């Protein structure tokens, strides 16, 4: 319903928040990556179609965000191990970005009419690596898949992160994620 309003006023800005996962699929997150790839494709098409109407579409591709969201994310299989990986990764300084910093980068990109914004994140190098060396990148991701938890556990059933706690999570390793969960009302 927003697009007709933008057309009537003769301009507009649309921001679609996808993910670095919409540019590079990673093991154990394939449904997530598929949805983000679809959003990136939709945004690219909209950007091309709407530019002539002075409506700019920006696609934001953040990496890991330290928001505390793993507490409410859904995990399957060996849910405790999966949750541990995500909650620790969400807490590593320099790997995960806080929401305010990401929001400022997205807002800046929108204001300047940029087509895509890759929120500063160490994982962004995998996008360029994939484009230059697709086979090497796939081999590296296959190695990563081997260190992630195997299938099993609760099978197709699902558990939320807070139902998947273990000795490692919560722990001192997940302090930043725990703080972010409180700050962002994820508790």
State the predicted function of each range.
Residues 35:
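Active-site helix of classical SDR
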Residues 38, 42-46, 50, 60:
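Hydrophobic alpha-helix immediately C-terminal to the catalytic Tyr-X-X-X-Lys motif of short-chain
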Residues 1-10:
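A short helix-coil junction within the Rossmann-fold of NAD(P)-dependent oxidoreductases
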Residues 19:
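Residue(s) in the substrate-gating loop at a strand-loop-helix junction
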Residues 140-187:
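Non-catalytic terminal and boundary segments that flank Rossmann-like NAD(P)-dependent oxidoreductase
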Residues 52-132, 137-147:
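SDR active-site lid
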Residues 24-30:
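Active-site loop immediately N-terminal to the catalytic Tyr-X3-Lys motif
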Residues 6, 24, 45-55:
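Active-site-adjacent segment of SDR/Rossmann-fold oxidoreductases
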């Amino acid at each position: 319903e927003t697009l007709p309003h933008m057309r009537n006023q003769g301009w507009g800005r649309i921001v679609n928040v996808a993910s670095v996962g919409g540019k590079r699929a990673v093991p154990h997150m394939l449904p997530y990556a598929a949805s983000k790839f679809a959003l990136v494709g939709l945004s690219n098409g909209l950007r091309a179609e709407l530019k002539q109407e002075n409506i700019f579409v920006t696609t934001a591709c953040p990496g890991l965000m330290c928001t505390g969201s793993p507490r409410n994310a859904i995990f399957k299989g060996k849910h405790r191990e999966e949750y541990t990986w995500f909650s620790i990764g969400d807490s590593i300084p320099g790997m995960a970005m806080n929401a305010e910093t990401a929001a400022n980068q997205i807002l800046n990109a929108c204001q300047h009419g940029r087509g895509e914004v890759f929120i500063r994140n160490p994982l962004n190098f995998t996008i360029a690596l994939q484009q230059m060396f697709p086979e090497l990148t796939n081999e590296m991701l296959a190695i990563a898949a081997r260190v992630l938890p195997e299938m099993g556990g609760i099978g197709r059933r699902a558990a939320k992160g807070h139902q998947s706690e273990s000795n490692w999570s919560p722990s001192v390793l997940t302090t930043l994620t725990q703080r972010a969960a409180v700050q962002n009302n994820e508790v």
